[in-house]
Amino acid sequence: CIRDSSCWIVWDKCNGDTKWADCELAWTSFNTAVRKFAFMWNGMLQGKNIEEGWIMQGKKHLNEKRIHPTQKPVALYAWILKNYAQPGWKLLDTHTGSASSLIAFADAGYDYVAFEKDIGYYSEYLHRLQEHRSQITLFDCGVERV
């Protein structure tokens, strides 16, 4: 049972005229207004960044690889953290799936605890996290990757 809340998060997938859902909804316990996050997520078409999510990322090699059927973009979690999380919070993800949340948590400097019951997805997300961490270690020196 979901209790009443004034604040829902609406993720507009900016997917145009397709058979897929235009939006996804996330319940929150915050006592604020409904907020919308626009970020393209339609097959190979993915948004550019948090500020320009409705604009297609032009460099396909920078797109997130899909490893889970209900995968969300890292940018969605980054936006949620930016708008709702407080410094010093320790975050919990009980359905980690693709680890998009964990990438956003780590990038923003949050400690976290995560769970995934499917060993296949767990293995995939561990590999994804290791790849992400190695990219940060090797290449993030204030220079934009191309």
Spans of model-derived segments:
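Class I S-adenosyl-L-methionine
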Residues: 3-146
